[in-house]
Amino acid sequence: MTIVILVAITTASFFVWLTPQSYDATFVVSDFKSHLDEIKEIHGALADGIEKEFQKMLNGDITPDHYIEVAEISSSQINSQIIQLVESKASQEWQESYLNYLEALRATNSNMRETIVVANMIKENADKQNVDKVLKKIDQLKEESKSFVSASDSARP
C-alpha cells in the first residue's frame, strides 16, 4: 500500500515537471488554508509510509537497499512540497503558519536522510552503538517536525 501511495504521488509530481515552465513562472495560491491542508495531508502520508518501511527494514522484512530506494523517493516528494510552500508566496496573515510548516517539512526530510544513514550502516554491519546514536537523532527530528506542525496549526489565521 505504501508503495502504491508513493508511486501515485511521484507520478502526479512528474506532471508538474513535464509542464513547460518559463523562468518567471510562479505558483499562484489563492486559498492558503486548502493549500496548506493538502500539503499537510501529503506530508502525513509520506511520513507514515516511510516510518512503516523503516520499521520493516529494522525488522529485516525488507532490505536496506529497498528501503533506501523508497526513502529517496519520499525525500524527493518532501522536497517538492517544500518548493510548493516557498513558491506559494503566502499572504502576510498566513506567513507564520507556512514558515512553521516549511520547517516541519525540512525536519521530516532530515529525518528521512538519517534513516538512509541507518540503512547504509546496517548494510555495512556498523556497530550497534553508532546505529543507536543515529536512531536517537531520528526520534529528535520526528519530535521537531511535530512541534513545527503544532506551531503552524497555532499560527493559522
Each language-model region and where it sits:
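Short, solvent-exposed, charged loop/turn and helix-capping segments
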Residues: I78-L102, R156-P157
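Hydrophobic single-pass membrane-insertion segments
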Residues: A12-T26
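Helix-turn-helix repeat elements of alpha-solenoid scaffolds
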Residues: I73-Q77
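Alpha-helical interaction segments
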Residues: V4-V7, Q84, K137-I138
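C-terminal amphipathic alpha-helix
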Residues: A25-I68, A104-P157
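Hydrophobic membrane-insertion alpha-helices, especially the h-region
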Residues: M1-V16
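A short glycine-/small-residue-rich loop at the edge of a beta-strand within enzyme catalytic domains
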Residues: D65, E69-E72, K89-Q92
